Curated annotation (Swiss-Prot):
SUPFAM superfamilies: PB2 C-terminal domain-like
Species in which this protein is naturally found: Influenza A virus (strain A/Turkey/Wisconsin/1/1966 H9N2)
This protein's name: Polymerase basic protein 2
Entry keywords, A to Z: Cap snatching, Eukaryotic host gene expression shutoff by virus, Eukaryotic host transcription shutoff by virus, Host gene expression shutoff by virus, Host nucleus, Host-virus interaction, Inhibition of host RNA polymerase II by virus, mRNA capping, mRNA processing, Viral transcription, Virion
Extent of the signal sequence: none
Keyword Heme appears in the UniProt entry: no
InterPro entries tied to this protein: Flu_PB2_2nd, Flu_PB2_6th, Flu_PB2_C, Flu_PB2_CAP-bd, Flu_PB2_middle, Flu_PB2_N, INV_PB2, PB2_helical
Phylogenetic lineage: Viruses, Riboviria, Orthornavirae, Negarnaviricota, Polyploviricotina
Family: Belongs to the influenza viruses PB2 family.
Length: 759
């Protein structure tokens, strides 16, 4: 206070003011400070005094020919005196105004293309809606966020190659454009920027904004997608927030969101298959998101989410070293532990085998709606400081931390038996058993935990067993903070391994992720996700399974038909028929299968009874393990649309309807494709009937001797080949089948093969 008073007195004397404003600065140290190096030491001041000068700008001499000396108002636009120390002209700010109004114009067609990200941002803000401002304490936590809406996901190196190719195509240097996205973008941009007069360096800068994801570690409360981050300064302050709805979406946010949904669906589906890891990989490789292969997106997209990270681990990509438990991301910030198996007894006297972490450790816990700092020792929670959006979110974090601590009072709080299972009906591991139990009801856990009196610490309050705040008492070791806990900022990635049950471990063997950690939240994807794998047919319900199964048979009919006649068992075991089984009533599966297989065998044995449409219709039913029974069926039931619907063994039904006129199949009213051949049996040629039991291999082959007549064929041994004369004097090579069971009665196939062999 004294100093301020003294300064005020000094300033009130006119002499002080005069000294401060008029005296020249001639102290060498000061001059050195402000003149050494090219970096401006005080940009704001420099700008102020430059603009106070008459000619603060320097320009090339050519400007004197392009701009008049005076404007319409008679004000001087440039000075005849040269700029000291350079061969340039001193120019007034008024010259800029003159140039903007009267200078040469150029084509503006390329501006929206080059400055695309800016134009799009203006549109988003124009159509965005700003709501009311609310004043409240903001719990912000630093998260790594995408600050650059509307970008592709190229790596810096990939983007550099694209930029060089587009902007400086004639520069020397090897550029390898390999990925599909690189090639597409390069082609598109070259066309867009033909005859572009904007400075190449500027174009390069702007392209970089479009191609590369830029992330920053920023304090955020609320939305983290890039269209919210670009208005962060407008939507949240220290003690206020403004509601905002973006006026448009950008593809990069949509990709992130759709990727998470696809990954969750795939992990959930893989869990219940016989070989989860193989299934997961098959699905990742056959899925597209917004028309781009999912595996390409996984390689480039830095999104960290449990399901996405499991997919990345399966592909052999590095992922973050933090681990996941109860939907929270744990990152150890100090301490260490060794793991030891220990048997513990629950309050219900059930024995659990848990892996105990021995040693002192500190963790940060980050969830979507709550964050915490946890300090623990062996089977003991020392301190938990938690911050969150609401009571519910804080409670979730407390439960997870209590279970993670492995304290005895938590295990003793279990009432009833623990027998939670995952989607594949396998028992969960003990830690997840405990977690599920208390997530359902944590009353006993909170009651038994114990409470303590607390000191008054700024920004911290206590929380009671019923989750109400208190300034006097709190659950033992637990405090609620007004501040959030920052997410782990490092982008370091580590090598991990994954086992067949999709458990991801680091090189030390610590489990970082398991399918139990994948959220059950369902969302609607912003971009179209195309799952080509039959394992994902059921994602859109029973109808989709039905339509997809029949579409698959029709698409692959040529191959299916040959297998049907030669190797039916292999055909019945195809994974494409797996989803269909869930539609067939459990009790009837085996009987239907036995019935259909017998029917098919009769078709193979009795000439002329082959019926394409009927085979297609009944084939999926033959995939279940068959029961030997003499039962006959005139219709088979499938469970769709919430009830049993019938497929008629002979003839059409609403479920399966083949139109002879259009040769198209409709399943539940949806088009399932066309049969390219004529399934009408009247066209069956006599040759195909006579050649029953022989496989047509192709054109005549002289090595197998002269052509036999059809009657002479009966003398061939199984597996023997011969040329045979058929029809109008054509010769084809045939082989007598090795197995009677797989005799080809498919008249179309035989006729078709004869045709192919002749032509």
């Amino acid at each position: 206070m004294e100093r301020i008073k003294e300064l005020r007195d000094l300033m009130s004397q006119s002499r002080t003011r005069e000294i401060l404003t008029k005296t020249t600065v001639d102290h060498m140290a000061i001059i050195k400070k402000y003149t050494s190096g090219r970096q401006e030491k005080n940009p704001a001041l420099r700008m102020k005094w430059m603009m106070a000068m008459k000619y603060p700008i320097t320009a090339d001499k050519r400007i004197m020919e392009m701009i008049p000396e005076r404007n319409e108002q008679g004000q001087t636009l440039w000075s005849k005196t040269n700029d000291a120390g350079s061969d340039r002209v001193m120019v007034s700010p008024l010259a800029v105004t003159w140039w903007n109004r009267n200078g040469p114009t150029t084509s503006t067609v390329h501006y929206p293309k080059v400055y695309k990200t800016y134009f799009e941002k203006v549109e988003r803000l124009k159509h965005g809606t700003f709501g009311p401002v609310h004043f409240r304490n903001q719990v912000k936590i630093r998260r790594r966020v995408d600050i650059n809406p509307g970008h592709a996901d190229l790596s810096a190196k990939e983007a550099q190659d694209v930029i060089m190719e587009v902007v400086f195509p004639n520069e020397v240097g090897a550029r390898i454009l390999t990925s599909e996205s690189q090639l597409t973008i390069t082609k598109e941009k070259k066309e867009e920027l033909q005859d572009c007069k904007i400075a190449p360096l500027m174009v390069a800068y702007m392209l970089e904004r479009e191609l590369v994801r830029k992330t920053r570690f920023l304090p955020v409360a609320g939305g983290t997608s890039s269209v919210y981050i670009e208005v962060l300064h407008l939507t949240q302050g220290t003690c206020w927030e403004q509601m905002y709805t973006p006026g448009g979406e950008v593809r990069n946010d949509d990709v992130d969101q759709s990727l998470i949904i696809a990954a969750r669906n795939i992990v959930r589906r893989a869990m219940v298959s016989a070989d989860p890891l193989a299934s997961l990989l098959e699905m990742c490789h056959s899925t597209q998101i917004g028309g781009i292969r999912m595996v390409d997106i996984l390689r480039q997209n830095p999104t960290e989410e449990q399901a996405v990270d499991i997919c990345k681990a399966a592909m052999g990509l590095r992922i973050s070293s933090s681990f996941s438990f109860g939907g929270f991301t744990f990152k150890r910030t100090s301490g260490s532990s060794v793991k030891r198996e220990e048997e513990v007894l629950t309050g219900n006297l059930q024995t659990l085998k848990i892996r105990v972490h021995e040693g002192y450790e500190e963790f940060t816990m980050v969830g979507r709606r709550a964050t915490a700092i946890l300090r623990k020792a062996t089977r003991r929670l020392i301190q938990l400081i938690v911050g969150g959006r609401d009571e519910q979110s804080i409670a979730e974090a407390i439960i997870v931390a209590m279970v993670f601590s492995q304290e005895d009072c938590m295990i003793k709080a279990v009432r009833g038996d623990l027998n939670f299972v995952n989607r594949a009906n396998q028992r969960l591991n003990p830690m997840h058993q405990l977690l599920r139990h208390f997530q359902k009801d944590a009353k006993v856990l909170f009651q038994n935990w114990g409470i303590e009196t607390i000191d008054n610490v700024m920004g911290m309050i206590g929380i009671l067993p019923d989750m109400t705040p208190s300034t006097e008492m709190s659950l033992r070791g637990i405090r609620v903070s007004k501040m959030g806990v920052d997410e782990y900022s490092s982008t370091e990635r580590v090598v991990v391994s994954i086992d067949r049950f999709l458990r991801v471990r680091d090189l030390r063997g610590n489990v970082l992720l398991s399918p139990e950690e994948v959220s059950e939240t369902q969302g609607t994807e912003k971009l179209t996700i195309t799952y080509s794998s039959s394992m994902m047919w059921e994602i859109n319900g029973p109808e989709s399974v039905l339509v997809n199964t029949y579409q698959w048979i029709i698409r692959n009919w040529e191959a299916v038909k040959i297998q049907w006649s030669q190797d039916p068992t292999m055909l019945y075991n195809k994974m494409e028929f797996e989803p269909f089984q869930s539609l067939v009533p459990k009790a009837a599966r085996g009987q239907y299968s036995g019935f259909v297989r017998t029917l098919f065998q009769q078709m193979r044995d009795v000439i002329g009874t082959f019926d394409t449409v009927q085979i297609i219709k009944l084939l999926p039913f033959a995939a279940a393990p068959p029961e030997q029974s003499r039962m006959q069926f005139s219709s088979l039931t499938v469970n769709v649309r919430g009830s049993g619907m019938r497929i008629l063994v002979r003839g059409n039904s609403p479920v399966f309807n083949y139109s002879k006129a259009t040769k198209r199949l409709t399943v539940l009213g949806k088009d399932a494709g066309a049969l390219t051949e004529d399934p009408d049996e009247g066209t069956a040629g006599v040759e195909s009937a006579v050649l029953r039991g022989f496989l047509i291999l192709g054109k005549e082959d002289k090595r197998y001797g002269p052509a036999l007549s059809i009657n002479e064929l009966s003398n061939l041994a199984k597996g023997e080949k011969a040329n045979v004369l058929i029809g109008q004097g054509d010769v084809v090579l045939v082989m007598k089948r090795k197995r009677d069971s797989s005799i080809l009665t498919d008249s179309q196939t035989a006729t078709k093969r004869i045709r192919m062999a002749i032509n």
